[in-house]
């Protein structure tokens, strides 16, 4: 009887540990396809943000959207969602036009040069990027 109780307690502890570990890692948002481009967007909440940042190694381009706010001890980024994003190739063809669902967007693009535009409160920021297949992070930051 004593051995059975120990097994039951061990099994319960193992199940609780596994359950806690699974709860700490949020699932990735769904991958969406637009033409030849696969992307995902999200990162609202610490768990989802950590999950997306961990997955960034599998995407040649990661975008981050933030506004600089002034805190007591210096500027502090405030992450933004619902940011309209347009990616064009150098011929001006739109290869992706979407709105972010969180402060991070991971994009799989063919190798090449692209012009990326992101908008917040009517202010458009543009970046020219060379996608090589190696992971790259672009930060779009607006004044608050």
Go through the PLM ranges and name each one:
Residues 83-95:
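Short amphipathic beta-strand segments in non-cytosolic proteins
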Residues 1-11:
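Bacterial N-terminal signal peptides that target proteins for export
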């Amino acid at each position: 009887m004593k051995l059975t109780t120990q097994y039951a307690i061990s099994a319960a502890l193992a199940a609780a540990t596994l359950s806690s570990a699974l709860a700490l890692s949020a699932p990735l948002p769904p991958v969406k396809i637009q033409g030849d481009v696969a992307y995902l967007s999200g990162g609202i909440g610490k768990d989802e943000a950590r999950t997306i940042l961990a997955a960034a190694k599998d995407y040649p381009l990661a975008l981050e959207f933030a506004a600089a706010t002034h805190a007591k001890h210096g500027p502090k980024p405030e992450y933004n969602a619902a940011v309209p994003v347009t990616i064009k190739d150098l011929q001006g063809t739109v290869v992706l036009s979407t709105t972010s669902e969180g402060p991070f967007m991971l994009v799989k693009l063919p190798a090449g040069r692209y012009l990326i535009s992101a908008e917040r409160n009517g202010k458009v920021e543009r970046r020219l990027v060379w996608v090589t297949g190696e992971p790259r992070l672009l930060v779009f930051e607006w004044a608050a």
